[in-house]
């Protein structure tokens, strides 16, 4: 019934509207104590805890940035058994993003194409939401960015401020490689390093799925030079050749945007495998992108995530 009736009906509704409705339901669920207790008991994974530096993960399965952009429901999401959750991407000032519709399903490929444009409510709203965090229950990351990626001074000031502002609640931070030019990002990370000495929260670089393998040595060297603690591999891809089941007309109709979901799994695994073999062993490597089932998760672990 789900595949033949329910799913086709749901897929007629705009993907972002479905996402927003799920967020609303999670906000309602927040106040349903007995149901939350039951949910936690049902989704309590029988997994071996994992420790890295001073972070204690209840398990190795997390939720990437992009779902909880406003950091408004990470506590409720943790009831589903995630060992860590990443909120964001967050910028100092509100970003409306690109016009809707901006998230599209390609069900034949088990993929989404998104061109949201880093929409988020800004620092103050996210900070208010972060105050609901329950320490020790899960690891919480925050993906941060600047409103002015082309302005070195503003980018440095904004990202350093976000790192400091969220430090009471964030267990780690992520910055997207490619969202800021390397020469500006270098200046940003030099400034953040001074704050990091005081605050001590780790910083990861999230790499895009299309990063050339031959560029990874340079990125690893950059990361070591700037005291980066690890990598998340990978984010979306622009490579339309990955969409082997959708028609050209369907892909053209959707238009621009990054591909996420199953089609990017092999690119993600390739990057994870290279990082695992060549990055310093003390760096944490988190596999992301294309993980849809336990089979993909196992492949990520085998690759070194």
Show which residues each predicted segment covers.
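Conserved, mostly hydrophobic/aromatic
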Residues: 14, 63, 85, 126, ...
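Glycine/Thr-rich beta-alpha phosphate-binding loop at enzyme active sites
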Residues: 27-29, 34-43, 177-187, 222-278
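Catalytic cores of alpha/beta
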Residues: 72-79, 211-225, 276-277, 281, ...
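A gly/proline- and charged-residue-enriched helix-loop-helix capping module
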Residues: 88-137
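Active-site-adjacent beta->alpha loops and helix N-cap segments on the catalytic face
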Residues: 93-102, 123-124, 179-201, 210-217, ...
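Active-site glycine- and acidic-residue-rich loops that bind
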Residues: 147-159, 181-184, 204-224
């Amino acid at each position: 019934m789900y595949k033949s009736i329910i799913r086709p009906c749901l897929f007629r509704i705009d993907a972002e509207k479905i996402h927003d409705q799920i967020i609303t339901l999670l906000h309602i669920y927040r106040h349903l104590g007995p149901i939350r207790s039951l949910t936690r008991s049902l989704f309590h994974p029988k997994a071996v805890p994992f420790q890295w530096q001073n972070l204690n993960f209840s398990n190795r399965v997390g939720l990437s940035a992009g779902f909880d952009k406003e950091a408004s429901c990470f506590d409720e999401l943790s009831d589903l058994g995630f060992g860590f959750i990443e909120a964001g991407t967050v910028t100092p000032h509100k970003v409306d993003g690109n016009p809707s519709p901006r998230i599209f399903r390609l069900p034949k490929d088990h993929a989404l194409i998104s061109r949201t444009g880093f929409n988020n409510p800004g620092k103050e709203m996210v900070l208010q939401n972060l105050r609901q965090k329950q320490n020790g229950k899960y690891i919480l990351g925050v993906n941060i960015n600047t409103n002015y990626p082309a302005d070195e001074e503003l980018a440095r000031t904004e990202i350093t401020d976000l790192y400091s502002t969220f430090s009471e609640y964030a267990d780690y931070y992520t910055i997207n490689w490619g969202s800021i030019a390397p020469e500006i990002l270098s200046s940003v990370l030099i400034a953040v390093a001074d704050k990091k000495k005081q605050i001590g929260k780790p910083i990861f670089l999230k790499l895009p799925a299309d990063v050339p393998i031959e560029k990874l040595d340079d990125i690893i060297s950059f990361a070591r030079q700037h005291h980066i603690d690890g990598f998340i591999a990978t984010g979306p891809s622009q490579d339309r050749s990955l969409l082997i089941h959708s028609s050209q007309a369907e892909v053209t109709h959707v238009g621009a945007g990054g591909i996420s979901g199953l089609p990017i799994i092999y690119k993600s695994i390739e990057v994870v495998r290279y990082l695992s073999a060549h990055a310093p062993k003390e760096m944490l490597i988190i596999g992301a992108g294309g993980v849809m089932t336990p089979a993909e998760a196992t492949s990520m672990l085998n690759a070194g995530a």
